[in-house]
Amino acid sequence: MTSIVIKSTDSGAPTLTGQTGSLVTVLDKCLVVNHVFGTSDDVGFTDQSVEARSEGGTPFNLLLTNVTAARLYIGMPTTFSRAKFDLATVGVGGTYIWEYWNGSAWTTLTVTDGTSGFTADGTVTWTIPSLWATTAVNAVTQYWVRIRASVTPGTNPTVNFVTVGGWTRSHTAATNQAAWRQGTGSNGFIFRLVGDGTTQDRAVGYETLTTLGSTLAGDTATGRFPTDAQFSGGLYWTKSSTADATARPWVVAVSEKLFHLYTDHLSTNTTATHHIFGDIKTFKTGDAYHTIHIAGATVTPGSTNRAADLVAVGAAVLTAHFMSRNYTQLGTSIIISKHSDAAKLGGISTPMGAGGLVFPNPIDGGLYLAQVYVHETSASIVRGELPGFWAPLHSRPLTHLDTFTGTGTLAGRTFMALNMYNSAQAFLETSDTWNV
């Protein structure tokens, strides 16, 4: 699994506002791919981003024309280490060169090519170069890789979709109605967004989606979570406190299986909201229904978003926390809750990072954090771990957006502090080390 973290302040990142469609754009460009441009001469460009994101879109040529001057550019607001290709027509022949911008020139990028030269579907991976720098391509400044042919192919491959975040746009219907499918190794479930809200949008999960309607009622789907009986109209995904063009800070962390969306709807970094959709690290062998959906419970931003809250196993449920099915794999959507190292935290129903140990710990100068677990509330059953999300065992020990590197059992992992509502703080894991 590969994870990537994108912030609103990154170069070329999309803008989140209190206007319709803005969250659809953010998720398109973070969960799938930000930009895909084709060119035959590095002067005129064709924007193939929409086609590249969509499973059902119109296939496009990998190279606009079958000449050595043709290039395909793939860009993201931050560095990335993979691109997955689904081909409509496989290539025949050709030699391809991958390159990145090192600050002064396009330089060869050594890749592991899972497509075998675009003769099959697959993922191309690489180690992120230390000298990788942003540059402008078609007036968009961000991190780019480019693909060109030193020997032109006999058959130019055509591409159904390409994804960097690992997800794909599975369906497209009316404007601002969208659905994305989880990627490789996941349950393959659907995140369905009703993106026509202003300050907030509504969302549900589906196990399968056949037809995307202009409203939730128009969808042809199975396995909705939460069900309409549990939560009519879907959970609330907050964008902004005002229905206008004011840009709001946000952070997206995404792997093939799960994504986090943090939105600072007031631009104050004190009462921000957090949203999660995807597969947890399940403790059940063969679990096919461990996909969660956590967001807000009412139209009021912040106060009813409980993503940072923890409870004791068997204690009261957390609002707007759902999973597709219980551990028996039977039935429909269930309510879930989260817990962590409550003994050190000093309470059994406290937002993470809102109390606990002295920081730094006076004995060893340590910053303590704990894994977050997901449990089924009806029978006090621990289902698994929540990837990428950690609980500080101190009272807001760090400044918002501070970063740090773990030690001991957490060596090699990096983290970012995120301030939330009710004096809470959570740690987002920013390295490609999520538990899966």
Set out the residue ranges of the language-model regions.
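Long, leucine/valine-rich, helix-dominated scaffolding and oligomerization segments
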Residues: 6-11, 15-28, 174-433
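Short, low-complexity N-terminal tether/leader segments at secretion or assembly junctions of large
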Residues: 1-13, 146-155
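Signature of Asx- and small-polar-rich beta-strand/turn repeats characteristic
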Residues: 28-177
